[in-house]
């Protein structure tokens, strides 16, 4: 009820605060028998963690995950899995000057009016640090889906600020700090260096895709696969928009173009983004998210204090000038959690369903 749990059959309860002793999650519903070690999870956490380049926050957290329960002799037991990530590099004194003021664009004002109190240190529960446990949970989902169906997830940065990034190759993504699918990122580095010197921030657009998704995942009406994907992506800090498939470009398309024609060898296009009627087609799930500029910047801005008086706010501390730089593994994780949830639902309800029509995407593969 408090909004800290994502999913039902694969339920992930997120806990902790940015400057508390630890953050983490409890996964309830992971099938038993999955070989799982901390190393399986750490790979994705390392992709998301702070302090990895000059273009992200310099808060130096190792984000080392600890498996506290739900795994015995290297395999999941089917009972709740508790994953813990200790906070080691908090610097709460940086927030002393904003205890009685509200940062524009941040959750300070809304949290205070909801709860009657707030934790200003790093944003408390509103901090993007709380995405780390979701990345950890997503790594578990990714592993199960890969072994069960051969499903894989990957993402990249498609735009940063006003710079559109053309897609060249997935091979480039892990080779630069931006998750950019291009060989040369010097122009992105120059852009971010200038932005940091100006004391400002920028937004980003992230593309994430899932391949090898079984056909038939998703439910009619209110539990559509694409509806749950949008819900999951909007749960990521700073996300302000979600597109699936052609997204808003569908407005300018015509039916002769937008409808994905079928052939015995597979679909001829993927404007639907891998979902028709809320149910997966077996094509790649194609999702894009829009991320707003970081709210915490050192440029003075107009605000009010807790008494309602005018105030000028300057946010000190260590912050990402573009939170989108580290968002790619987060978006991958949330997509994996949605696919995992619906895979378990499909297995529970329709495991015995057979149809005579061939699965054209599997046949092609």
Swiss-Prot record:
Coiled coil: none annotated. It comes from the Bacteria. Keywords: Amino-acid biosynthesis, Aromatic amino acid biosynthesis, FAD, Flavoprotein, FMN, Lyase, NADP. GO terms for molecular function: chorismate synthase activity; FMN binding. It catalyses: 5-O-(1-carboxyvinyl)-3-phosphoshikimate = chorismate + phosphate. FMN binds at residues 125-127, 237-238, 277, 292-296, 318. Reduced FMN (FMNH(2)). NADP(+) binds at residues 48, 54. Pathway: Metabolic intermediate biosynthesis; chorismate biosynthesis; chorismate from D-erythrose 4-phosphate and phosphoenolpyruvate: step 7/7. GO terms for cellular component: cytosol. One of its GO terms (biological process) is amino acid biosynthetic process. It holds the Pfam family Chorismate_synt. PROSITE patterns: CHORISMATE_SYNTHASE_1 (PS00787), CHORISMATE_SYNTHASE_2 (PS00788), CHORISMATE_SYNTHASE_3 (PS00789). Its cofactor is FMNH2. CDD domains: Chorismate_synthase. Its EC number is 4.2.3.5. Homotetramer. PANTHER family: CHORISMATE SYNTHASE. This reaction introduces a second double bond into the aromatic ring system. Belongs to the chorismate synthase family. NCBIfam families: aroC, PRK05382.1. This is Chorismate synthase. It comes from Polaromonas sp. (strain JS666 / ATCC BAA-500). The gene is aroC.
